[in-house]
Design a protein with these regions (language model features):
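Conserved class I S-adenosyl-L-methionine
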Residues: 1-40, 54, 58, 76-79, 140-168
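Class I SAM-dependent methyltransferase SAM/SAH-binding core
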Residues: 46-48, 52-100
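A short acidic, Gly/Pro-enriched loop at the edge of an enzyme's catalytic core
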Residues: 102-112
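A short SAM/SAH-binding and catalytic strip from SAM-dependent methyltransferases
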Residues: 111-124
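A short glycine-rich, Lys/Arg-flanked "PGG" loop and its adjoining helix->strand segment in the class I
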Residues: 125-137
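Short alpha-helix
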Residues: 177-200
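Core SAM-dependent methyltransferase catalytic element
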Residues: 193-195, 214-236
Length: 236
């Protein structure tokens, strides 16, 4: 599935709004990923699949020296431009993540962030190889995706199914698809690329999610919706 078709039109607008204060993106995934990032002061960061720019503004606020955002959805990139404004330390690229990141040089980023995008792609291994290439030796990759257990509970079948499934976004009526994967597949592809695992977390929603949607907040306390990892490129 081409990422350029994933969040266009009304779906892109819905996602941009929901990611601002929704229980899952804003109050489950993002706090966990930013905690995994630690101190980003002075770092050059790649946000692959930057969406509406929420991570970009957070990373800049936390001291990142420069952030490069790459996004396949033109609609989401418009939202990102509006959110980022005229920050000279931010560069945005409209680019399909199914394709190589040929416009980015080798060993040029301290930190890569891939938040809830990698499960939409068919060329996952190719993207991971590109991320490994553009990170500096000793650089860090943060990656989050849908938790395999949540997929099994929501979509049924076998835990080991790795088919494409369709998901509905809240009460909006909007739908999208992504590919399920087991934990073995998820971690195996990262390790096969040459990354070393430093930390894995299964985020629970923060208390702020209760204010937004208590029912969905409580769901995250029973079922792990996402899994997030901190990986390291060998310093060589």
């Amino acid at each position: 599935m081409r990422i350029s078709t994933a969040y266009e039109g009304a779906l892109g607008d819905y996602f941009a709004g929901n990611a601002t204060d929704g229980p899952y993106n804003a109050h489950t995934d993002r706090p966990a990923m930013l905690e995994l990032a630690g101190d980003v002061t002075g770092l050059r960061v790649l946000d692959a699949g930057c969406g509406a720019g929420h991570y970009i503004t957070e990373l800049r606020a936390r001291g990142a020296a420069e952030v490069v955002g790459v996004e396949g959805s033109a609609r989401l990139l418009d939202h990102a431009r509006d959110r980022v404004g005229d920050d000279p330390a931010v560069t945005l690229h409209h680019h399909d993540l199914e394709e190589p990141l040929a416009f980015l040089p080798d060993d040029s980023f301290d930190l890569g962030v891939v938040a809830l995008v990698h499960h939409h792609l068919e060329a996952r291994r190719e993207l991971l190889a590109e991320l490994h290439r553009v990170l500096r030796p000793g650089g860090t990759l943060l990656l989050s995706t849908v938790h395999p257990t949540a997929d099994w509970i929501w979509h049924g079948g076998s835990y080991f199914d790795e088919d494409r499934v369709e998901t509905r976004f809240g009460d909006s009526g909007a739908t999208n698809s992504y590919r399920r994967m087991t934990m073995q597949t998820f971690l195996g592809e990262l390790l096969d690329t040459g990354f070393a695992l430093e930390r894995l977390v299964e985020p629970r929603a923060t208390e702020a999610a209760r204010r937004v949607d208590e029912a969905r907040y409580l769901k995250t306390l029973r079922t792990p919706f996402f899994v997030a990892v901190r990986m390291r490129k060998d310093a060589g």
